[in-house]
């Protein structure tokens, strides 16, 4: 098919602008965050080392491998989460009956005695391993570790929360979340995935993702509020970070996500924090389903993919609902006020309109 020369010229200019933006803005942001991560991980590792001395069941899993830290997630340029993987989940059954969307419980297997578990004192009378009890014990240990660690002058435990959050240099916040890694199993609540008759992801990639599994996190969540208080405290949140990252390999998918995060930092830090990196990552996964061919994720398509994701985001903000990729009954906007979401949709539309109507938009962004 012949393509008009002016269309080729416009596309070439757009590719040039996006590549320039990636080099001058995105990579600079990534470099700055990498420097911050190196500093804060050194401090967090020291705190976790002290925790392990006090309580050997909490073994630090924050290790650097091929330039990245396992279990570390960047929430924003100043907020981070470290997932601390615990050992010996084996004597518990994973119960995912749908009564707690986005969460599950760990119940002592039939015929197993409490004494067979490494976590015996955190098992409830009903035989559930309590996420809240484990987090409470971990909170106490971290508070003591902060007082003893060599960096105590620059790190503090954030008060008035059951979460374990460290404030470092009065600027960075690091949440440390106890978790279990569940490999080789897949939650029933995500059994519908992948949707039939959609060519992406490839069956081999699906098998890889399901083998990778998911994590169970001990943390507070708006999705559990209003449920039975005991069940809420005992429940563990489903977390699919590694599965999501695996799906985003290939083509310019990860580059799209890096550009989206940079645009978010520079233009979408709004009152009430309606939009976070995870919303953008979720919508990127939906965009992958809409555009399943690898040719739709090359350099020439990046602008179209970004616009598609922003238009999806506007729709979600206006409908006041953003479904989780693996658990669509879970609304990622839950707890956000309509006013905050409406304001965000206007900001996203301005950003999207600029990208759609100006070939030089990325010079200004």
From Swiss-Prot:
Family classification: Belongs to the mab-21 family.
SMART domains for this protein: Mab-21
Protein name as it appears in the record: Protein mab-21-like
Record InterPro entries: Mab-21-like_nuc_Trfase, Mab-21_HhH/H2TH-like, MAB21L/cGLR
Pfam family, one: Mab-21
Protein species of origin: Anopheles gambiae
